[in-house]
């Protein structure tokens, strides 16, 4: 997302990614990093834990699944719940979950990556409009 924003000449947007199931430092999965690198994206670092402070400071919170939506509402101040959107709905107008590829086949990762890449392009388009 950061690379797409920079390539699109869009500044002033802060991007953060965090997990809803992980606490503490967790290395990113090798297959995910490899697929991203094949497409010119850097996925270094460790997974970031979702925190109340991080969520409440966000203008928009894009989740992949309804489960993640529910997890976010547990930490997010009620008055900010309108900031939560599901990825497929925000990007494509489809009220569906984006399946979690973690610990599945490489094919599932690649399919998920393609959807995320298309969706991120749509987000950049919306921000640049």
Regions found by a protein language model. Give the residues of each.
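Conserved active-site segments centered on acidic
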Residues: 1-58, 125-129
């Amino acid at each position: 997302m950061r690379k797409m924003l920079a390539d699109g000449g869009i500044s002033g947007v802060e991007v953060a990614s965090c997990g809803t199931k992980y606490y503490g430092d967790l290395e990113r999965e090798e297959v995910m990093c490899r697929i991203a690198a094949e497409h010119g994206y850097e996925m270094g670092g460790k997974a970031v834990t979702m925190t109340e402070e991080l969520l409440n400071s966000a203008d928009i919170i894009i989740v992949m699944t309804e489960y993640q939506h529910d997890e976010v509402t547990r930490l997010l101040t009620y008055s900010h719940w309108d900031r939560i959107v599901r990825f497929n709905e925000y990007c494509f107008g489809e009220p569906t979950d984006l399946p979690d590829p973690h610990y599945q086949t490489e094919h599932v990762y690649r399919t998920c990556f393609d959807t995320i890449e298309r969706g991120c392009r749509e987000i950049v388009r919306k921000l640049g409009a």
